[in-house]
């Protein structure tokens, strides 16, 4: 039964199916009765809650406060920022009526045609418009600035091809929206939040990222600059893990958000927006997990340590439970989340397989012989290595082991990326190498036409213009025209 529990399609056979199998079998999420919308199950939601708590603390440490704005946005609001609405128009879900009525033949309910709204309402795909309409009421003077708001919410984008966590019609996210008195302040804010996201990705998700700026055609709709963090998944595809947008005065002008500056002159407010979503759970899975199941970094694992008793009698279980109670108390005192699984409806082998599948970083097992010898078996999920150690000082041992696992998971992902990022100088070589599932650094002439040609012919996109690294100019691999620096190309989720 334990083998059946873990039967996953191997990554080498079908990476996409492996991912789908794992999300379902590890009890993270499932499809719902609504097309493109998922049910996030308790274990998956526990990971999101940990992400939320950590990010929320990071936002508050950088001066942000939480607020909540309406789910429904008047259609006219979206019409005020042309670029913005064009970017989201095809994905918008529209509310046209406000009432149902019982069908005359008694077969159920129908939309009441008399309840048609005068103006349709859009279920938010993102909240810039409703928030900037509100900011107009909050801002009169430079003394009212900056406004640094974050919102935890759900949004809807009517995606046609959906995949659990990675791309769903409805998803959970946070969206920050800030207003500033100067361009410089807003640009600093946008870059700062990119740094916050990179810090979270690398130090909590154990996922190395490349920080960069999006090309003009890949920017957020209505942004002057989009700062991104890009991660490599195990199949070599890129995943955009977070974005921060410098919006200039576009929304200030669209919603007439003006203020009197220090010199007594009227000006439009400067804007940023930034967000990450439940997509990060998909990134977490694809960055670290293996053919045995999830591999979760300890900093985000809902259960960091599980303890399984192995016993032959009720009396022996009682003795093991008494011994384990002291270990549990010591681990919890160090802030470690621990579960003691003494349920009698599953055998130890089943439990081992289940917690391996669920990616619990450390598994402890205690049997009768361990009880006699004051020992305990320790298994680490990242390497599947086992050893038997003394119970004396077990809490410090486990604490250090969790940090070692966190560092090792990051190093493994970092080494994988570094081994699969290459420089390419010719378009022929580019077309050949992109099939290998790699990140490619290549010269581009800066035109959207060349970018589009590469995308159409190879399915690779410019993920970003990296902020760090080699800035040596060169010649575009396609046109031979001058190129300011190499940019990052990859196929992407």
Curated annotation (Swiss-Prot):
Record SUPFAM superfamilies? C-terminal domain of ProRS, Class II aaRS ABD-related, Class II aaRS and biotin synthetases
GO cellular component terms, semicolon-separated: aminoacyl-tRNA synthetase multienzyme complex; cytoplasm
CDD domains reported in the protein's UniProt record = ProRS_anticodon_zinc, ProRS_core_arch_euk
Q: Keywords in UniProt for this one?
A: Aminoacyl-tRNA synthetase, ATP-binding, Cytoplasm, Ligase, Nucleotide-binding, Protein biosynthesis
Annotated GO MF terms? ATP binding; proline-tRNA ligase activity
Q: If you read the UniProt record, what top EC class would you report for this enzyme, in one word?
A: ligase
Comment block on domains: Consists of three domains: the N-terminal catalytic domain, the anticodon-binding domain and the C-terminal extension.
**UniProt protein name:** Proline--tRNA ligase
């Amino acid at each position: 039964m334990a083998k059946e529990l873990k039967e996953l399609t191997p990554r080498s056979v079908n990476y996409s199916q492996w991912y789908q199998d794992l999300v379902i079998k590890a009890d993270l999420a499932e499809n719902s009765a609504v097309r493109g919308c998922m049910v996030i199950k308790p274990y998956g939601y526990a990971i999101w809650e940990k992400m939320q708590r950590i990010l929320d603390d990071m936002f508050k440490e950088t001066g942000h406060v939480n607020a909540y704005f309406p789910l429904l946005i008047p259609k006219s609001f979206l019409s005020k920022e042309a670029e913005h609405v064009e970017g989201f128009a095809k994905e918008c879900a529209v509310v046209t009526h406000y009432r149902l009525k019982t069908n005359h033949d008694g077969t159920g309910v129908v939309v009441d045609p008399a309840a048609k709204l005068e103006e349709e309402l859009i279920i938010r795909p993102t909240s810039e418009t409703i928030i900037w309409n509100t900011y107009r009421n909050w801002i009169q003077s430079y003394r009212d600035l900056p406004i640094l708001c974050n919102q935890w919410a759900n949004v809807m984008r009517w995606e046609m091809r959906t995949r659990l966590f990675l791309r769903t019609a409805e998803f959970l996210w946070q969206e920050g929206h800030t207003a500033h008195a100067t361009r410089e302040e807003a640009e600093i804010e946008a870059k700062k939040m990119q740094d916050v996201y990179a810090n979270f990705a690398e130090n909590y998700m154990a996922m190395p990222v490349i920080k960069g700026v999006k090309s003009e055609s890949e920017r957020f709709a209505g942004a002057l600059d989009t700062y991104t963090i890009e991660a490599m998944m195990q199949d070599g595809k890129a995943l955009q893990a977070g974005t921060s947008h410098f919006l200039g005065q576009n929304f200030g002008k669209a919603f007439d958000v003006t203020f009197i500056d220090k010199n007594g002159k009227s000006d439009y407010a400067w804007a940023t927006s930034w967000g990450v979503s439940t997509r990060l759970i998909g990134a977490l899975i694809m960055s670290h997990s293996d053919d045995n199941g999830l591999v979760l970094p300890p900093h985000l694992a809902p259960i960091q340590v599980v303890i399984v008793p192995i016993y032959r009698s009720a009396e022996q279980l009682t003795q093991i439970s008494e011994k384990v109670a002291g270990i549990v108390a010591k681990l919890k005192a160090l802030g470690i989340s621990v579960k003691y699984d003494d349920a009698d409806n599953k055998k130890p082998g089943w439990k081992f397989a289940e917690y391996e599948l669920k990616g619990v970083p450390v598994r402890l097992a205690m049997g009768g012989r361990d009880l006699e010898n004051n020992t305990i078996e320790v298994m680490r999920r990242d390497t599947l290595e086992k050893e038997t150690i003394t119970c004396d000082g077990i809490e410090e041992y486990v604490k250090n082991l969790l940090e070692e696992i966190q560092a090792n998971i990051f190093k493994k992902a970092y080494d994988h990326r570094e081994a699969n990022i290459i420089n390419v100088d010719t378009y022929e070589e580019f077309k050949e190498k992109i099939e290998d599932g790699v990140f490619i650094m290549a010269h581009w002439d800066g035109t959207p036409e060349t970018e589009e040609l590469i995308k159409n012919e190879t399915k690779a996109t410019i993920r970003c213009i990296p902020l760090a690294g080699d800035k040596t100019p060169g010649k575009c691999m396609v046109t031979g025209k001058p190129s300011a620096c190499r940019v990052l190309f990859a196929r992407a989720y």
